[in-house]
Design a protein with these regions (language model features):
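Short basic helix-loop element that most often maps to the first helix and adjoining turn
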Residues: 9-28
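DNA major-groove recognition helix of helix-turn-helix/homeodomain DNA-binding modules
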Residues: 50-65
Length: 68
């Protein structure tokens, strides 16, 4: 599995661990809901570092954790 595929999977797993819906997570992170769903479903395989930083901050993890 490539890191591109793992990003969406990891974002979803960390979000679920926090008990956040996609909508709530999108609002808290400042990332558009549609962008978040595309990341989690691997439509967007390479999100920008800016978006990754926003997601990682709310999830309480590093960007590196999201790409492992």
């Amino acid at each position: 599995m490539t890191s591109e595929i793992k990003i969406g999977k990891n974002v979803k797993e960390y979000r679920n661990k926090l008990g956040l819906s996609q909508e709530d997570f999108a609002k808290k992170s400042g990332v558009k809901y549609t962008t978040l769903t595309k990341i989690e479903s691997n439509v967007i395989k390479k999100p920008s570092v800016f978006i990754m930083a926003k997601l990682a901050k709310i999830l309480g993890v590093s960007i590196e954790d999201l790409i492992k």
